[in-house]
UniProtKB/Swiss-Prot annotation:
UniProt entry keywords in alphabetical sequence: 4Fe-4S, Cytoplasm, Iron, Iron-sulfur, Metal-binding, S-adenosyl-L-methionine, Transferase, tRNA processing
Residues at which [4Fe-4S] cluster 1 binds: C19, C55, C89
Any Pfam family hit: Radical_SAM
Domain of life: Bacteria
MTTase N-terminal domain residues: 10-126
UniProt-recorded name of the protein: tRNA-2-methylthio-N(6)-dimethylallyladenosine synthase
Length: 460
C-alpha cells in the first residue's frame, strides 16, 4: 500500500520476463512505486507508467521485449505523459543504445539499480532521460516488496555471478556476486512470516556460491558464510513451514549442503541443479567447471540421503561444435538420472560472449530437431517419474484457486509437483489458500497431479 503521506501519482504496470530473480526484482520495484503513491493498473493500456523488466539470456526473449516496446512507444507518441521504463538485463546490456532505438523511453536501468527506482524516477520527473547501468553496490533492505503471493515468497540472498560460462551473458548484465548478510536475510524472512507467509524460496544466480564474498573463516579453516550455514541460521524462523532454494551450480553443491537438506525438516526435497550437457568436452567448452562424473556423484548423494527427492535441471542442445555423439550423451544422462523436469533450450548466441564468435555454429535445422527430440524424452521421463505418486498421500501447500476451475485449489508438494484438488473435501471441509493439505493422488500427468483432499494438516 502507498505510504500515508504519498500523493496519488496514477497507475503502473510491470511486465516481467525471465527468471525468478527478475520476478523478485519486479516485486521490489512494485513496492517502491506504491510507496511513491502509484497504484496497480487493471490493464497495461490503462497504466500511466509502464515498466518492462527484461531478460536477455536468449534472443527470443529479447526480441519479445522490443515487440512490446514498439507498441508502447507508439502509444507514448500520442500520450507524452506516459512514463516508459526498461529495467533488467536487456537494459544493462544495451544501455544508451536503447534510447537510440526507442527514443520514447524515459528510463533505462540495469538490475543492480532496482532499489534506486524512486531516485531515478525523480530525475525523470525533472525532465531528464535517464540511463543507469553503471556498477552499483546493491543497497540492503531499503524497500518493501509488493508480493504477488501472500503464501509463498522469494528472498534474494546473493546477487550477480562470478562464473564465466562461454555462452552466458548474465555476469556482464548482473555484475559480480554480492551476498547479503545472514542477519538481513533472517530479518526479511521473519517479516514475511509475520505477514502469514508459509514458504520461502531463497534466490541466487548461483545460490550455493553464497558467502564467497563475505569475510570470515571458521576455526576449522572453512568459510564462515556458506549456503549450508545460512540454512541452519534461518531454519527456525517461526511460522515458515517450508524452505526452498534456487538455482544451484554443481561446482559448489557440497556433501555438507546435501546433509543439511536431509537433516533440516523445513527444507523441501526438490533440487534444481543445471547440468547443461552430458558430455565432458562440451562442458569444458562451456567453461562449466565440473564433469559429468562430478554431477552424477551429487545426484547419487542426494538420492542416498533423500530417496524420494525430485530433481530438475537446465540443458542446452546444439552448442557450437556439439556432435551427434555428444548430443546422444546428453540424452543418455537424462534417461539415466530420471529427472522430474528439465528446462531445455537450443543454443542462442548472445552478444559479448566467447561462444558467439566461434565458427562451429550448428545450423538452425539441427537445433530444431535436437530440441524436439530432447523435449519428447523430457516429457516421457517426467511422466514416468510422476507415476510413482499415484495412490500416495502428499502434503500440498495450497497456493491459490485453479484459474480453469474455481472449485479447485492448486499448490505444490514438498517435491515441487503442481497438484490440483477440490477445495471442498469429501467430508465437506472447505480448504483455503495457505492451508497445508493431505491430498491422495488420483491422477498423474507429465507435469502435474490431481487428487482428493483428506482431513486438513494445518489451516492458515
Amino acid at each position: 500500500m502507498p505510504a500515508a503521506n504519498a500523493q496519488s501519482r496514477g497507475s503502473y504496470w510491470i511486465t516481467t520476463f525471465g527468471c525468478q530473480m527478475n520476478k523478485a526484482d519486479s516485486e521490489r520495484m512494485a513496492g517502491i512505486l506504491e510507496s511513491m503513491g502509484y497504484r496497480a493498473a487493471n490493464a497495461e493500456l490503462e497504466a500511466d507508467l509502464v515498466l518492462y523488466n527484461t531478460c536477455t539470456i536468449r534472443d527470443n526473449a529479447e526480441q519479445k521485449v522490443y515487440s512490446y516496446l514498439g507498441r508502447q512507444a507508439q502509444r507514448k507518441r500520442l500520450d507524452p505523459n506516459l512514463t516508459l521504463i526498461v529495467a533488467g538485463c536487456v537494459a544493462q546490456q544495451e544501455g544508451e543504445s536503447l534510447l537510440r532505438r526507442v527514443p520514447e523511453l524515459d528510463l533505462v536501468m540495469g538490475p543492480q539499480h532496482a532499489n534506486r527506482l524512486e531516485v531515478l524516477l525523480n530525475r525523470v520527473d525533472s525532465g531528464q532521460q535517464v540511463v543507469a547501468t553503471e556498477d552499483h553496490h546493491i543497497l540492503e533492505d531499503i524497500t518493501t516488496a509488493r508480493r504477488d503471493s501472500s503464501i509463498c515468497g522469494w528472498v534474494n540472498v546473493i546477487y550477480g555471478c562470478n562464473e564465466r560460462c562461454t555462452y552466458c551473458v548474465v555476469p556482464s548484465v548482473r555484475g559480480k556476486e554480492q551476498s547479503r548478510l545472514p542477519e538481513a536475510i533472517r530479518l526479511e524472512m521473519e517479516g514475511l512470516a509475520a505477514q502469514g507467509y508459509k514458504e520461502i524460496t531463497l534466490l541466487g544466480q548461483n545460490i550455493d556460491a553464497y558467502g564467497r564474498d563475505l569475510p570470515g573463516i571458521t576455526p576449522e579453516g572453512r568459510r564462515q558464510h556458506t549456503l549450508t550455514d545460512l540454512l541452519h541460521q534461518v531454519h527456525d524462523v517461526s511460522g515458515i513451514k517450508r524452505i526452498r532454494f534456487a538455482t544451484s551450480h554443481p561446482r559448489y553443491f557440497t556433501e555438507r549442503l546435501i546433509d543439511a537438506c536431509a537433516d533440516l525438516p523445513k527444507l523441501c526435497e526438490h533440487f534444481h541443479i543445471p547440468f547443461q550437457s552430458g558430455d565432458n568436452d562440451v562442458l569444458r567448452a562451456m567453461a562449466r567447471g565440473y564433469t559429468v562424473e562430478r554431477y552424477r556423484r551429487i545426484i547419487d548423494r542426494i538420492r542416498e540421503r533423500m530417496p524420494d527427492a525430485s530433481l530438475s535441471a537446465d540443458v542446452i542442445v546444439a552448442f557450437p561444435g556439439e556432435t551427434d555423439l555428444q548430443y546422444q550423451r546428453t540424452l543418455d544422462l537424462i534417461e539415466e538420472i530420471g529427472f522430474d523436469q528439465v528446462n531445455t533450450a537450443a543454443y542462442s548466441p548472445r552478444p559479448n560472449t566467447p561462444a558467439a564468435t566461434w565458427d562451429n555454429q550448428l545450423p538452425e535445422e539441427v537445433k530444431v530437431i535436437r530440441l524436439q527430440t530432447i523435449n519428447a524424452l523430457v516429457e516421457r521421463c517426467a511422466r514416468e517419474r510422476n507415476a510413482r505418486y499415484a495412490g500416495r498421500t502428499e502434503e500440498v501447500l495450497a497456493e491459490g484457486i485453479n484459474p480453469k476451475d474455481p472449485s479447485q485449489l492448486m499448490g505444490r508438494t514438498r517435491t515441487n509437483r503442481l497438484t490440483f484438488f477440490q477445495a471442498a473435501g469429501p467430508d465437506g471441509h472447505q480448504h483455503n489458500p495457505g492451508d497445508l493439505v493431505n491430498v491422495r493422488i488420483d491422477a498423474v500427468r507429465s507435469f502435474s497431479l490431481s487428487g482428493t483432499p483428506l482431513p486438513c494438516v494445518e489451516q492458515r
